[in-house]
Amino acid sequence: NSGVGNKLVYLLTDGDTFNGKTVSGMGQAAVRNLYWETVALMPVSPNYHDLHDLLLDAAGNLGMTSTQIANVQTACEAVEID
């Protein structure tokens, strides 16, 4: 977990507590689909704030539950990109 993005993927995939935020693991398949959709939405030269917003948009596009979307938000808060 050498970087913000790597830590975020780890938290979403496996779950853990970081910076006082507890994130539930969603598994590799769900996170892979989430990031695939996120990348499809990305503008040229995105930043971490964009990543936060796009992850939430992608989660909604994929029909994730409100609990799953809240989990994505919590993971973003944990790595401080919210």
Regions found by a protein language model. Name each.
Residues 1-82:
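Extracellular low-complexity, Gly/Ser/Thr-rich intrinsically disordered linkers
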